[in-house]
Amino acid sequence: MSNVGFSATRGITSGAPDKVDMSLDDIIRLNKKEQQARRPSPGNRRPLQKGKVFVQGRPVGARARGQTQRGGGVPRGAITRAGVGRGRKIPPPVGRRRGQGVITGLAARKTAALQKGISPLNRPAINRKLQPFNNRSRPFNNQSRPFIQSAQYRQMQGQRRPYRQTDIQRGLNSTRPFQQRRRPLPPVQTQREARQATFLFRRGLKVHTQVPKPALTSIPPAPVRPRQWRTSTNSSGILTVSIDNPTAMTQSEPPCAWSLHPPAPTSSAPVKMKVEEEKKTEPPKGVPLQFDINIVGKPTAMTLNERFRILKDERVATAQTSKGSRFVTVG
């Protein structure tokens, strides 16, 4: 080290040295010592002087005081101190650990930006651990909706659920878990009949089942509709339409003629009489039409009334040709 540098180091302790005669290394060392002497220790921190400005790029002092008064003070949720920029949060102390699952920093800002368009009623909580237990039962925040009183909110809740009946035993204010109302399951007999009806329906047989009414319970069951008549959907259905025929038999057949279980014969003589009567009776004379029932559902240009009118006109025309032109048909 040169004599100039030695004299410069001696001048540091005595007073403000003259940096013109120093070397570059000595000037750097001198500046570091001055910065360490200016920096306050953590135990006894002195307030900043009035003339000091630009701590970490922010003005501190008279200018900053004017800005805080103009801008409305420290931003909410941010505790500031000297040497830290305005609006920056202080990290937690060394002794305390942050709880697991707490979203902080840029991730919290990102979730808040994603939930910007969601209603606060439907928005899930970002940090469940940060929510105080006492504030969960509050319906609304007083700062966001000060115009809704607690009595009005209770009235709104009552209007929102008018169908709920209060239980006399439990009381008005007691809470109970949500109970889903389900229909009671049908009895085994009904299920068996339904399976049998489906089995017979697939084979083209008519089935008409009456579902028995279940016993009255506390919950009123839904109305059960009886099963419809099920007919075969084959395309070979024949529809017989009877047109006015004075010679046809108008009296209906007795029930014993179409019953599946006729009464047992008592003697041989009445049986012969019944056989002779059955031979004498003739079936009603009608006009059998080969008619497909499935055509009704298909879009056709001709309706049933037009079809039957054409058949009637043909019958009248044949009658006129046989008897002469004595009748005039009026459509």
UniProtKB/Swiss-Prot annotation:
Pfam families found in the cross-reference section: FYTT
One Gene Ontology term of the molecular function aspect: mRNA binding
Record region (Disordered): 30-51, 63-99, 158-193
GO CC aspect terms: nuclear speck; nucleoplasm
Keyword set, alphabetical order: mRNA transport, Nucleus, RNA-binding, Transport
GO annotation, biological process: mRNA export from nucleus
Subcellular location: Nucleus, Nucleoplasm; Nucleus speckle
Protein role: Required for mRNA export from the nucleus to the cytoplasm. Acts as an adapter that uses the ddx39b/uap56-nfx1 pathway to ensure efficient mRNA export and delivering to the nuclear pore.
Name under which the protein is recorded: UAP56-interacting factor
Species for this entry: Salmo salar
Name of the gene encoding the protein in the UniProt record: fyttd1
